[in-house]
Amino acid sequence: EEAMAAKRQPLSRAAREESKKKFYAVNVYEKKPNDEDYSMYAYGLFTNLSKIALKMNVENRYKVECLIVTEEDDQVYAKDGAYLAPFLHGANKGTKATNAFVFSKDENLNGLTKGETAIANGKSVQYPRLVKLYGTINDFSPKATKDLTIDMRRAVFGLHFKVTPPNEGKLIITYAGWHITLTKSSAAYDNRATYSFSDILKACQDGYQTTMDVKAVWTKDDGTVEEESKQLLLKRNVMTVVNIKVEGQKPKSFIFKEEESNMTTENVEWDLIL
C-alpha cells in the first residue's frame, strides 16, 4: 500500500492536463414551513466554482447535494455538448455545463451517487479513472447561517500495477472492466491510476473498503491456456501496489547416479576326478 499523492508526469501527459475539466454537479431541495418533506428546487452543472450561487427564501429550509468530478486518465463523455452519466437529469437526458442553476420541481441530476460513468466514445464503466467527491448538507437555514459549506468527501482508490512480461505467448490481466495485455516482446508494465468507487455513498465514509477480482490469462506458444484469479482488497484513499509475474514449469534436469564399478570376488571350487 502507498499513500495517495501527486506524482510527476512525463511532458506528454502533462500537456494533456490543460484539457481536463473539474465539474460541480449540484442538486438543491427546498422545504417550506408547512411542508413535511423536501421538494426539488434547482439543479446545475458547473465548471466555474465562482458561478455557484443561489438565492434562497429565508423562511424556508434547504438540502443540498454535490458531486465534484475531476478528470484524470478518463474524461466524462459529452454528446452534442451535453454530458452523460453521472450528470444525467430527468429521464436519462444529458446535461450541459451552463454554469447556471435550472429551477425545476420535476427533475434534477439523479445519478450523482451511482458509479456508472460514461467515458470515451460513450463507454459506460463502474470504476472510472477520475476523482469523485460527494457531500450533502441538510436543513440549511438561510436565516440562521450566512455561509453554506458542504463537507466534500473523496470516494476513490488507487491501483499501481507492475507486470513482468511472460517468457512466451500472451498475458492478459483483467480487472474492473479494464485490461492489460503483454507479450514476450513487451516492455515491463508499470502504471498507476486513481479510480472512483461504484458505491459513492458508502465509499466516502472513513474506513470504507471492498474487494475486486483480478484475473490473469496466459496463452502459451503451444496454445495452452493457464488461468488464475485473485481478490484484491481496495481501500478508500489507498494506492494498492500489485506485482504480477508469471512463470511456466522450468525444464527438469536429468541426473544419472551410476553404480560404482567395484566388483566383489567370489570363488567357485570345481574339482574334477575323472
Residue spans of the language-model regions?
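Short structural boundary motif marking the start of a folded domain
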Residues: 1, 24, 157-159
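Structural motif
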Residues: 1-19, 162-170
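Tryptophan-paired
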Residues: 16-80, 85-87, 169-238, 268-274
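Structured interaction patches on ligand/partner-binding surfaces of diverse proteins
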Residues: 45-48, 72-146, 220-249
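Residues within well-ordered beta-strands of beta-sheet-rich folds
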Residues: 65, 160-162
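Compact mixed alphabeta submodule
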Residues: 142-149, 164-167
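Conserved "repeat-terminator" motif of extracellular CCP/Sushi domains
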Residues: 148-156
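Hydrophobic, glycine-enriched assembly/anchoring segments
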Residues: 242-274
